[in-house]
Amino acid sequence: AETTAAGAGLATARGPGGSGAGAAQRTTLVDMQPDLLPPATAPAAVGLVTAAACLIKADQPMYYAACPEEGNNKKVVEENGKWYCEATQKTYDTCRRRYILRLKVQDHSGAGWVNVFHEQAREMLGVDAEDLHAIRESDPAEYERVVKRAQFKDWHLKLKAKTEEYQGESRRRLTVLQCAVPDYAAEAKHLLERIRAVWA
């Protein structure tokens, strides 16, 4: 997939499926995870963060088997070498692998776990889910190397933060809506502007 420099377009692009995650401002991971969480009924917050992917667990499920029909990303179950989709009530000879993973990211303010879905995960890992599955099946050592190579890389992320209720407890869920390779010249300019604002 083609990468986008400097996070171009991230500030105004809408979230996946036109979810309405609109204009976003630069922020930090700590600011997106306040100690006092908003209620679950509050709208999601959207922000732009430059952070490094500092931990991807190679032993975690990083993708799932999805229905091969275009536009249907529902999970399928393997049965006797075939794949059954409950959504379509059909059995298929093949399936598609789609990413769904959690990774830890860190910026200057702190760290947080984010959920990353197919398109963004493919960008960040640098390999398609089908290819990663084939590597995992044939060469577990290479699979671990591929995952490790994706760590400690900087990304300009458009994040959505939403409070969720789970078993009576509130927690903050961070989701990567978009990702791009940072433009370090633009980042340096932004930092300079912040320093000047402090001393103005």
Language-model-derived ranges and their functions:
Residues A1-A200:
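Single-stranded nucleic acid-binding proteins centered on OB/S1-type folds
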